[in-house]
Amino acid sequence: MSSLDVEEVIETIEMIRMRNLDVRAVTLGINLLDRAHPDPEELARDVREKIVEVAGDLVEVVEEVEDELGVPIVNKRIAVTPCSIVAASAVRKEGREAVLTLAEALDEAAEEVGVDYLGGYTALVYDGFTEADEAVLDTIPEAIEGTERLCASVVVADERYGINMDAVYRTAEAVKETAERTDGHGCARLVALTNAPENTPFMAGAFHGVGQPEACVNVGISGPGVVRAVVEELKDVDFRTLHDEIKRTAFKITRVGELVGRRVAERLGVEFGAVDLSLAPTPEEGDSVAEILEGIGLESCGCPGSTAALHLLMDAVKKGGAAATSRHGGYSEAFIPVSEDAGMARAAEEALTLEKLEAMTAVCSVGIDMVVVPGDTPVETIAGIIADEAAIGVVTGKPTAVRIIPAPGKEPGDEFEMGGLLGRAPVMDVSDYRPTMFRRDGRIPPKFPR
């Protein structure tokens, strides 16, 4: 072994032990199209059987790889073909009850194989609704209330088709009802998406796209603590040097993620899909994207200059990660969820406003994520927030999303506790002015091509 090899091994060990490096998620995508059936009970039974058959060894294999490599793997997850596609014929026969039966079966399968979450209770409605899309969208609050692991997503916009404003408003209604049914907590498992990637390992927006293989493993990396340590050691360098060092660090982090993903896929006998290069924070101190930005030179995340600092970070991470693997996918950006990032939650009590957060999402993916707002926030306001993020996605071509939590009984400045990796966050203030335009029907067209 060369001295360089030894040095790299030591650096990796230090990243894991001292700087919270982990693999955030290993997600097994499973195609369910071959289990479509017009009878809801048979559909549910066949889907559950296939998930247990394909994913039965997932948790055991992931834990074996974790022990062998010494790399912590935080979450094991499953993503399936969107339910609005799989259940289309059953919905035609039995209506909305067909997708609720399927939701229950998916949650039971997730519990049986031992994964943390299962994504794919999804409606792809960026250019209109099918009968099954409407069934999924209308039942999201009930499905989330009745399950523990099921995640729901609605793809409301796409850069090629524009924004389906009817879908935006109905998704906002689903968010509001879900909050009322679950005391806000269920909204962590519901997201509105634009330009949704079909191979992301991250919830709540993960689903297994129809262009994906029969089954594949996608991996989500972490590493904010590692990047933060690098930034803190380079306080006096110029921006180009800082960019280069972040890029080199992202390269190493991505290598770890790909190694884990390939080994898990090989042992499960499925294809290796992609590494999502996103920096995913946690509520743990020191594992924060906001603290990276502050290390670059912000007094508090959200102050002027925050968007530029985030752009520098994202460009370096993407370039370093792309050099490390040819199989990058998903969002591959920095995540800035408020409740899941202790630094972002702290910033929301200081310089960070909802409007500044929206501006920052223009240079990174995911968007308005895990933001807690007052429980009496009107549906029109939630729809406006979703539409604004969708517009950013349509114009830039980037994946964007909204995962917003109206906390019943809470007012601006109150604290809302989610628990675990979902963390806690202050309730952020929203404008008192309502966007009454969202009572209109129809679509906002895509941008004119350059």
UniProtKB/Swiss-Prot annotation:
Domain of life per record: Archaea
CDD domains in the cross-refs: RNR_PFL_like_DUF711
Pfam families (UniProt xref): DUF711
InterPro entries in the cross-refs: UPF0210
UniProt cross-references to HAMAP family, sorted A to Z: UPF0210
NCBIfam families for the chain: PRK05313.1
Family: Belongs to the UPF0210 family.
Protein name: UPF0210 protein MK1214
Organism: Methanopyrus kandleri (strain AV19 / DSM 6324 / JCM 9639 / NBRC 100938)
